[in-house]
Protein backbone atom coordinates (compact mmCIF):
# COMPACT_ATOMS: atom_id res chain seq x y z
CA UNK A 1 0.00 0.00 0.00
CA UNK A 2 1.47 3.38 -0.94
CA UNK A 3 1.70 6.34 1.40
CA UNK A 4 -1.17 8.24 -0.23
CA UNK A 5 -3.59 5.37 0.46
CA UNK A 6 -2.31 5.03 4.02
CA UNK A 7 -3.04 8.69 4.67
CA UNK A 8 -6.56 8.31 3.24
CA UNK A 9 -7.28 5.32 5.50
CA UNK A 10 -6.38 7.17 8.66
CA UNK A 11 -9.05 7.63 11.28
CA UNK A 12 -9.23 7.93 15.03
CA UNK A 13 -12.00 5.35 15.51
CA UNK A 14 -14.75 7.70 16.69
CA UNK A 15 -17.34 4.93 16.95
CA UNK A 16 -15.18 2.98 19.41
CA UNK A 17 -16.61 3.07 22.93
CA UNK A 18 -19.26 5.64 21.99
CA UNK A 19 -21.58 6.35 24.92
CA UNK A 20 -19.51 4.47 27.52
CA UNK A 21 -19.92 5.94 31.03
CA UNK A 22 -17.04 7.83 32.64
CA UNK A 23 -15.67 6.05 35.71
CA UNK A 24 -14.31 9.36 37.02
CA UNK A 25 -17.10 11.86 36.32
CA UNK A 26 -19.98 9.37 36.76
CA UNK A 27 -23.34 10.92 35.81
CA UNK A 28 -21.74 14.31 35.00
CA UNK A 29 -20.59 12.84 31.67
CA UNK A 30 -23.24 12.08 29.05
CA UNK A 31 -21.13 9.20 27.73
CA UNK A 32 -17.88 8.83 25.82
CA UNK A 33 -17.62 10.75 22.56
CA UNK A 34 -14.15 11.03 21.07
CA UNK A 35 -12.95 14.54 20.22
CA UNK A 36 -12.18 14.84 16.52
CA UNK A 37 -8.40 15.10 17.08
CA UNK A 38 -7.72 15.11 20.81
CA UNK A 39 -7.60 11.69 22.50
CA UNK A 40 -10.26 12.71 25.03
CA UNK A 41 -14.02 12.71 25.51
CA UNK A 42 -15.76 15.78 24.10
CA UNK A 43 -18.26 15.76 26.97
CA UNK A 44 -16.10 15.48 30.09
CA UNK A 45 -12.52 15.96 28.74
CA UNK A 46 -11.32 12.70 30.37
CA UNK A 47 -9.31 10.16 28.39
CA UNK A 48 -10.77 6.99 26.93
CA UNK A 49 -8.99 4.97 29.62
CA UNK A 50 -11.18 6.71 32.24
CA UNK A 51 -14.34 5.36 30.57
CA UNK A 52 -15.86 1.90 30.85
CA UNK A 53 -15.04 0.99 27.26
CA UNK A 54 -14.88 -2.69 26.29
CA UNK A 55 -11.54 -2.81 24.52
CA UNK A 56 -10.19 -6.36 24.93
CA UNK A 57 -10.06 -7.14 21.20
CA UNK A 58 -8.84 -3.66 20.30
CA UNK A 59 -6.07 -3.81 22.91
CA UNK A 60 -5.07 -7.30 21.76
CA UNK A 61 -4.81 -5.99 18.19
CA UNK A 62 -2.69 -3.06 19.36
CA UNK A 63 -0.23 -5.24 21.27
CA UNK A 64 -0.27 -7.78 18.44
CA UNK A 65 0.78 -5.07 16.00
CA UNK A 66 3.52 -3.98 18.41
CA UNK A 67 5.00 -7.49 18.42
CA UNK A 68 4.67 -7.93 14.64
CA UNK A 69 8.05 -8.22 12.87
CA UNK A 70 9.87 -8.78 16.18
CA UNK A 71 11.32 -11.80 17.95
CA UNK A 72 8.12 -11.93 20.03
CA UNK A 73 5.90 -13.30 17.24
CA UNK A 74 5.24 -16.36 19.43
CA UNK A 75 3.03 -14.04 21.49
CA UNK A 76 0.76 -13.25 18.54
CA UNK A 77 -1.57 -15.11 16.19
CA UNK A 78 -2.86 -13.80 12.87
CA UNK A 79 -6.58 -13.89 12.24
CA UNK A 80 -7.44 -15.97 9.19
CA UNK A 81 -10.11 -13.50 8.06
CA UNK A 82 -7.98 -10.37 7.67
CA UNK A 83 -4.45 -11.34 8.71
CA UNK A 84 -4.45 -8.88 11.63
CA UNK A 85 -1.97 -9.93 14.33
CA UNK A 86 -3.67 -10.57 17.69
CA UNK A 87 -1.92 -10.67 21.05
CA UNK A 88 -2.14 -14.12 22.64
CA UNK A 89 -2.12 -12.98 26.24
CA UNK A 90 -1.84 -15.72 28.79
CA UNK A 91 -5.01 -15.99 30.89
CA UNK A 92 -4.64 -17.93 34.14
CA UNK A 93 -7.57 -19.58 35.94
CA UNK A 94 -6.99 -20.86 39.47
CA UNK A 95 -9.47 -23.09 41.30
CA UNK A 96 -9.36 -23.34 45.06
CA UNK A 97 -11.64 -25.72 47.02
CA UNK A 98 -13.49 -23.88 49.79
CA UNK A 99 -14.63 -25.99 52.75
CA UNK A 100 -18.21 -25.47 53.85
CA UNK A 101 -20.25 -27.13 56.61
CA UNK A 102 -22.01 -29.62 54.36
CA UNK A 103 -20.09 -29.68 51.10
CA UNK A 104 -17.04 -28.33 49.31
CA UNK A 105 -17.45 -25.50 46.80
CA UNK A 106 -14.93 -24.36 44.22
CA UNK A 107 -13.65 -20.80 44.22
CA UNK A 108 -12.40 -19.78 40.77
CA UNK A 109 -10.08 -16.82 40.22
CA UNK A 110 -9.35 -15.63 36.68
CA UNK A 111 -6.33 -13.46 35.92
CA UNK A 112 -6.84 -11.48 32.70
CA UNK A 113 -3.10 -11.72 32.13
CA UNK A 114 -0.37 -13.86 33.67
CA UNK A 115 3.30 -14.41 32.79
CA UNK A 116 3.56 -17.00 30.00
CA UNK A 117 5.46 -19.65 31.98
CA UNK A 118 4.79 -23.39 32.03
CA UNK A 119 5.10 -23.59 35.81
CA UNK A 120 1.73 -22.30 37.09
CA UNK A 121 3.02 -22.27 40.66
CA UNK A 122 5.68 -19.77 39.55
CA UNK A 123 3.02 -17.60 37.87
CA UNK A 124 0.93 -17.74 41.05
CA UNK A 125 3.97 -16.69 43.12
CA UNK A 126 4.57 -13.79 40.72
CA UNK A 127 0.99 -12.57 41.15
CA UNK A 128 1.16 -12.76 44.94
CA UNK A 129 4.26 -10.53 44.93
CA UNK A 130 2.34 -7.72 43.18
CA UNK A 131 0.31 -5.20 45.23
CA UNK A 132 -3.21 -6.61 45.58
CA UNK A 133 -4.75 -3.56 43.89
CA UNK A 134 -2.59 -4.24 40.82
CA UNK A 135 -3.24 -7.96 40.41
CA UNK A 136 -5.28 -8.30 37.17
CA UNK A 137 -8.09 -10.45 38.58
CA UNK A 138 -11.12 -10.28 36.28
CA UNK A 139 -13.67 -7.71 37.48
CA UNK A 140 -11.33 -6.23 40.09
CA UNK A 141 -9.55 -2.93 40.68
CA UNK A 142 -6.39 -4.63 39.41
CA UNK A 143 -8.00 -5.53 36.08
CA UNK A 144 -9.09 -1.92 35.67
CA UNK A 145 -5.53 -0.80 36.51
CA UNK A 146 -4.10 -3.09 33.80
CA UNK A 147 -6.61 -1.79 31.25
CA UNK A 148 -5.73 1.82 32.09
CA UNK A 149 -1.98 1.16 31.86
CA UNK A 150 -2.36 -0.59 28.49
CA UNK A 151 -3.94 2.59 27.17
CA UNK A 152 -1.48 4.93 28.89
CA UNK A 153 1.81 3.07 28.45
CA UNK A 154 1.27 1.74 24.92
CA UNK A 155 -0.71 4.36 22.96
CA UNK A 156 -1.83 3.01 19.59
CA UNK A 157 -0.86 6.36 18.05
CA UNK A 158 2.78 5.79 19.04
CA UNK A 159 3.10 2.88 16.61
CA UNK A 160 0.29 3.09 14.05
CA UNK A 161 0.13 6.07 11.64
CA UNK A 162 -3.52 5.25 10.90
CA UNK A 163 -4.39 6.20 14.50
CA UNK A 164 -2.91 9.70 14.07
CA UNK A 165 -4.49 12.95 12.92
CA UNK A 166 -3.70 14.12 9.38
CA UNK A 167 -0.08 13.03 9.01
CA UNK A 168 1.61 13.98 5.76
CA UNK A 169 3.12 11.19 3.60
CA UNK A 170 6.58 12.29 4.79
CA UNK A 171 5.50 12.09 8.45
CA UNK A 172 4.01 8.62 7.89
CA UNK A 173 7.29 7.39 6.43
CA UNK A 174 9.34 8.92 9.27
CA UNK A 175 7.03 7.39 11.87
CA UNK A 176 7.29 3.94 10.31
CA UNK A 177 11.08 4.17 10.41
CA UNK A 178 10.95 5.29 14.06
CA UNK A 179 8.72 2.34 15.02
CA UNK A 180 10.93 -0.12 13.15
CA UNK A 181 13.97 1.26 14.99
CA UNK A 182 12.53 0.99 18.49
CA UNK A 183 11.25 -2.52 17.79
CA UNK A 184 14.74 -3.65 16.85
CA UNK A 185 16.69 -1.67 19.47
CA UNK A 186 14.55 -1.17 22.59
CA UNK A 187 11.36 -3.27 22.78
CA UNK A 188 11.36 -6.32 25.04
CA UNK A 189 9.20 -8.56 27.21
CA UNK A 190 10.24 -9.56 30.71
CA UNK A 191 10.91 -13.19 31.56
CA UNK A 192 9.90 -14.70 34.93
CA UNK A 193 12.32 -17.26 36.31
CA UNK A 194 13.86 -18.43 39.55
CA UNK A 195 17.38 -16.97 39.84
CA UNK A 196 18.80 -20.44 40.53
CA UNK A 197 17.48 -21.56 37.11
CA UNK A 198 19.64 -18.94 35.44
CA UNK A 199 22.74 -20.24 37.24
CA UNK A 200 22.36 -23.49 35.33
CA UNK A 201 22.80 -21.62 32.03
CA UNK A 202 26.31 -20.60 33.00
CA UNK A 203 28.02 -17.23 33.41
CA UNK A 204 28.83 -16.89 29.73
CA UNK A 205 25.20 -16.46 28.73
CA UNK A 206 24.36 -14.35 31.76
CA UNK A 207 26.98 -11.63 31.35
CA UNK A 208 27.79 -11.66 35.06
CA UNK A 209 30.59 -9.04 35.06
CA UNK A 210 29.40 -5.54 35.94
CA UNK A 211 25.96 -6.61 37.12
CA UNK A 212 24.06 -6.03 40.31
CA UNK A 213 24.69 -9.61 41.33
CA UNK A 214 27.43 -10.40 43.79
CA UNK A 215 29.12 -13.72 44.52
CA UNK A 216 30.27 -14.28 48.08
CA UNK A 217 33.69 -15.66 47.18
CA UNK A 218 36.60 -13.75 45.68
CA UNK A 219 38.22 -14.94 42.45
CA UNK A 220 41.08 -16.58 44.33
CA UNK A 221 38.63 -18.66 46.32
CA UNK A 222 36.53 -19.93 43.42
CA UNK A 223 38.09 -23.37 43.67
CA UNK A 224 36.30 -23.87 46.99
CA UNK A 225 33.51 -26.29 46.13
CA UNK A 226 31.55 -25.93 49.35
CA UNK A 227 27.84 -25.16 49.06
CA UNK A 228 28.26 -22.06 51.19
CA UNK A 229 30.64 -20.47 48.68
CA UNK A 230 28.75 -21.66 45.62
CA UNK A 231 25.55 -19.95 46.75
CA UNK A 232 24.93 -16.68 44.93
CA UNK A 233 23.43 -13.57 46.47
CA UNK A 234 21.04 -11.62 44.24
CA UNK A 235 19.88 -8.03 44.58
CA UNK A 236 17.11 -6.22 42.72
CA UNK A 237 18.37 -3.80 40.06
CA UNK A 238 15.70 -1.29 41.10
CA UNK A 239 15.46 -1.30 44.91
CA UNK A 240 18.90 -2.90 45.56
CA UNK A 241 17.38 -5.17 48.23
CA UNK A 242 18.21 -8.86 48.32
CA UNK A 243 16.05 -11.40 46.55
CA UNK A 244 14.64 -14.13 48.78
CA UNK A 245 15.61 -17.66 47.85
CA UNK A 246 12.80 -19.37 45.95
CA UNK A 247 11.08 -16.12 44.92
CA UNK A 248 10.54 -15.46 41.20
CA UNK A 249 12.51 -12.69 39.52
CA UNK A 250 12.04 -10.81 36.26
CA UNK A 251 14.81 -10.71 33.70
CA UNK A 252 14.97 -8.33 30.74
CA UNK A 253 17.00 -9.73 27.87
CA UNK A 254 18.04 -6.33 26.53
CA UNK A 255 19.38 -5.40 29.96
CA UNK A 256 21.46 -8.58 30.21
CA UNK A 257 20.86 -11.56 32.44
CA UNK A 258 23.11 -10.14 35.14
CA UNK A 259 20.20 -7.85 36.13
CA UNK A 260 16.98 -8.91 37.77
CA UNK A 261 13.96 -7.28 39.39
CA UNK A 262 11.37 -8.07 42.03
CA UNK A 263 7.96 -8.42 40.27
CA UNK A 264 6.71 -5.22 41.98
CA UNK A 265 9.94 -3.37 41.03
CA UNK A 266 9.68 -3.99 37.27
CA UNK A 267 8.46 -0.44 36.64
CA UNK A 268 8.97 2.46 34.23
CA UNK A 269 11.80 4.71 35.40
CA UNK A 270 9.71 7.81 34.56
CA UNK A 271 6.13 7.14 35.73
CA UNK A 272 7.07 4.34 38.17
CA UNK A 273 4.03 2.30 37.18
CA UNK A 274 4.22 -1.48 36.75
CA UNK A 275 5.24 -2.27 33.18
CA UNK A 276 1.99 -3.64 31.79
CA UNK A 277 2.27 -7.32 30.81
CA UNK A 278 6.04 -6.92 31.45
CA UNK A 279 6.41 -5.04 28.12
CA UNK A 280 9.43 -2.77 28.44
CA UNK A 281 11.73 -0.49 26.46
CA UNK A 282 15.43 -0.39 27.42
CA UNK A 283 17.56 2.72 27.04
CA UNK A 284 20.67 4.01 28.82
CA UNK A 285 20.52 1.29 31.48
CA UNK A 286 16.90 2.16 32.35
CA UNK A 287 13.48 0.56 31.89
CA UNK A 288 10.74 2.61 30.25
CA UNK A 289 7.12 2.05 29.32
CA UNK A 290 6.34 2.66 25.65
CA UNK A 291 5.02 6.19 26.21
CA UNK A 292 8.00 7.45 28.16
CA UNK A 293 10.55 5.77 25.92
CA UNK A 294 9.00 7.58 22.94
CA UNK A 295 8.95 10.83 24.95
CA UNK A 296 12.70 10.45 25.45
CA UNK A 297 13.17 10.21 21.67
CA UNK A 298 10.60 12.62 20.18
CA UNK A 299 8.61 15.68 21.28
CA UNK A 300 4.95 14.93 22.04
CA UNK A 301 2.10 17.30 21.21
CA UNK A 302 0.29 18.41 24.37
CA UNK A 303 -2.84 18.90 22.28
CA UNK A 304 -3.33 15.60 20.44
CA UNK A 305 -0.93 13.45 22.52
CA UNK A 306 0.84 12.27 19.35
CA UNK A 307 4.57 12.26 18.71
CA UNK A 308 5.68 15.15 16.52
CA UNK A 309 7.39 14.16 13.27
CA UNK A 310 7.04 17.58 11.65
CA UNK A 311 10.10 19.84 11.43
CA UNK A 312 7.98 22.79 12.54
CA UNK A 313 6.21 22.88 15.88
CA UNK A 314 5.74 25.35 18.69
CA UNK A 315 6.79 25.37 22.34
CA UNK A 316 4.73 27.09 25.01
CA UNK A 317 4.36 26.66 28.76
CA UNK A 318 7.18 24.06 28.79
CA UNK A 319 5.20 21.86 26.40
CA UNK A 320 5.36 21.02 22.69
CA UNK A 321 2.54 21.49 20.21
CA UNK A 322 1.80 20.84 16.56
CA UNK A 323 1.27 24.28 15.03
CA UNK A 324 -2.37 23.42 14.23
CA UNK A 325 -2.99 22.01 17.72
CA UNK A 326 -2.01 24.99 19.88
CA UNK A 327 -5.68 25.69 20.48
CA UNK A 328 -8.10 26.67 23.21
CA UNK A 329 -8.91 23.58 25.28
CA UNK A 330 -12.56 24.65 25.47
CA UNK A 331 -13.47 25.85 21.97
CA UNK A 332 -10.49 24.68 19.79
CA UNK A 333 -9.81 28.15 18.38
CA UNK A 334 -6.18 28.68 17.28
CA UNK A 335 -4.19 30.59 19.92
CA UNK A 336 -1.18 31.73 17.88
CA UNK A 337 -0.79 35.47 18.58
CA UNK A 338 -3.82 35.49 20.92
CA UNK A 339 -4.13 36.09 24.65
CA UNK A 340 -4.65 32.84 26.56
CA UNK A 341 -4.74 31.66 30.17
CA UNK A 342 -3.44 28.30 31.44
CA UNK A 343 -6.11 26.36 33.34
CA UNK A 344 -4.93 23.02 34.78
CA UNK A 345 -1.97 23.07 32.36
CA UNK A 346 -4.32 23.58 29.38
CA UNK A 347 -4.42 26.81 27.34
CA UNK A 348 -7.79 28.57 27.23
CA UNK A 349 -8.65 31.61 25.11
CA UNK A 350 -9.70 34.81 26.89
CA UNK A 351 -13.43 34.63 26.01
CA UNK A 352 -13.67 31.01 27.20
CA UNK A 353 -11.73 31.82 30.35
CA UNK A 354 -14.10 34.66 31.26
CA UNK A 355 -17.13 32.51 30.43
CA UNK A 356 -16.11 29.20 32.02
CA UNK A 357 -13.23 29.66 34.45
CA UNK A 358 -12.92 33.24 35.70
CA UNK A 359 -13.36 33.92 39.39
CA UNK A 360 -16.21 36.21 40.40
CA UNK A 361 -15.54 39.46 42.24
CA UNK A 362 -17.08 39.53 45.73
CA UNK A 363 -17.64 43.26 45.30
CA UNK A 364 -19.41 43.70 41.95
CA UNK A 365 -20.24 39.99 41.35
CA UNK A 366 -18.85 40.12 37.81
CA UNK A 367 -16.16 37.86 36.33
CA UNK A 368 -12.61 39.16 36.79
CA UNK A 369 -10.77 39.63 33.49
CA UNK A 370 -7.48 37.62 33.41
CA UNK A 371 -5.50 40.78 32.55
CA UNK A 372 -6.96 42.82 35.41
CA UNK A 373 -5.30 42.98 38.83
CA UNK A 374 -7.18 41.31 41.63
CA UNK A 375 -6.98 40.72 45.37
CA UNK A 376 -7.46 37.14 46.60
CA UNK A 377 -7.88 35.75 50.07
CA UNK A 378 -8.64 32.07 50.65
CA UNK A 379 -11.29 31.22 48.03
CA UNK A 380 -12.51 34.81 47.58
CA UNK A 381 -11.39 37.41 45.03
CA UNK A 382 -12.05 41.10 44.30
CA UNK A 383 -11.12 43.50 41.55
CA UNK A 384 -8.15 45.47 42.88
CA UNK A 385 -10.08 48.72 42.45
CA UNK A 386 -11.53 51.47 44.63
CA UNK A 387 -15.01 50.38 43.52
CA UNK A 388 -14.77 46.72 44.57
CA UNK A 389 -12.26 46.08 47.34
CA UNK A 390 -14.13 48.02 50.05
CA UNK A 391 -15.08 47.59 53.68
CA UNK A 392 -18.39 45.72 53.71
CA UNK A 393 -19.70 48.15 56.34
CA UNK A 394 -18.42 51.69 55.69
CA UNK A 395 -17.22 51.25 52.05
CA UNK A 396 -13.70 52.45 52.86
CA UNK A 397 -11.18 51.44 50.16
CA UNK A 398 -8.95 48.65 51.53
CA UNK A 399 -6.24 48.52 48.84
CA UNK A 400 -2.92 48.59 50.67
CA UNK A 401 -4.71 48.55 54.05
CA UNK A 402 -5.13 45.93 56.75
CA UNK A 403 -8.50 44.19 56.68
CA UNK A 404 -10.52 41.56 58.52
CA UNK A 405 -12.07 38.83 56.32
CA UNK A 406 -15.33 37.19 57.45
CA UNK A 407 -17.10 34.70 55.13
CA UNK A 408 -16.58 36.59 51.90
CA UNK A 409 -16.88 40.03 53.49
CA UNK A 410 -13.99 42.31 54.48
CA UNK A 411 -13.91 44.96 57.20
CA UNK A 412 -11.57 47.84 57.95
CA UNK A 413 -11.97 47.58 61.74
CA UNK A 414 -13.43 45.60 64.62
CA UNK A 415 -16.10 48.29 64.99
CA UNK A 416 -17.33 47.82 61.41
CA UNK A 417 -17.33 44.06 61.86
CA UNK A 418 -19.47 44.39 65.02
CA UNK A 419 -21.93 46.67 63.24
CA UNK A 420 -22.52 44.02 60.56
CA UNK A 421 -22.80 41.07 62.95
UniProtKB/Swiss-Prot annotation:
Sample GO molecular function, one term: zinc ion binding
Ubl conjugation keyword on record: no
Basic and acidic residues compositional bias, start-end: 155-164
Residues in the signal sequence: none
UniProt KW keywords: Cell junction, Cytoplasm, LIM domain, Metal-binding, Repeat, Zinc
PROSITE patterns per record: LIM_DOMAIN_1, LIM_DOMAIN_2, PET
GO biological process, one term: negative regulation of cell population proliferation
Domain of life: Eukaryota
SMART domains hit by this protein: LIM
Region named Disordered: 133-164
Major location category of this protein: cytoplasm
Gene3D superfamilies: Cysteine Rich Protein (2.10.110.10)
Subunit-level organization: Interacts via LIM domain 1 with ZYX. Interacts (via LIM domain 3) with ENAH and VASP. Interacts with ALKBH4, talin, actin, alpha-actinin, GRIP1 and PXN. Interacts (via LIM domain 2) with ACTL7A (via N-terminus). Heterodimer with ACTL7A; the heterodimer interacts with ENAH to form a heterotrimer.
Family according to the record: Belongs to the prickle / espinas / testin family.
Functional note: Scaffold protein that may play a role in cell adhesion, cell spreading and in the reorganization of the actin cytoskeleton. Plays a role in the regulation of cell proliferation. May act as a tumor suppressor.
Protein's name in the database: Testin
Organism: Papio anubis
Lineage, highest ranks first: Eukaryota, Metazoa, Chordata, Craniata, Vertebrata
Amino acid sequence: MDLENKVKKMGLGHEQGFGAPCLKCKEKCEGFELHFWRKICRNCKCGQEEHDVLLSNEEDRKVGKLFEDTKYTTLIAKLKSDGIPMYKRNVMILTNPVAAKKNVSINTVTYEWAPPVQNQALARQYMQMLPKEKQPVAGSEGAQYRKKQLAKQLPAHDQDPSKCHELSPREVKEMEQFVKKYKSEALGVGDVKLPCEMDAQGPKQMNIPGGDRSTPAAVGAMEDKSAEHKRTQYSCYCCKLSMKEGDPAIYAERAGYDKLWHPACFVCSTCHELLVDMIYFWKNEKLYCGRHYCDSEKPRCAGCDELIFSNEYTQAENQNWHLKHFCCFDCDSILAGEIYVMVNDKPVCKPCYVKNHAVVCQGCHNAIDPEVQRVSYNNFSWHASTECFLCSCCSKCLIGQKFMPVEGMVFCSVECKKMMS
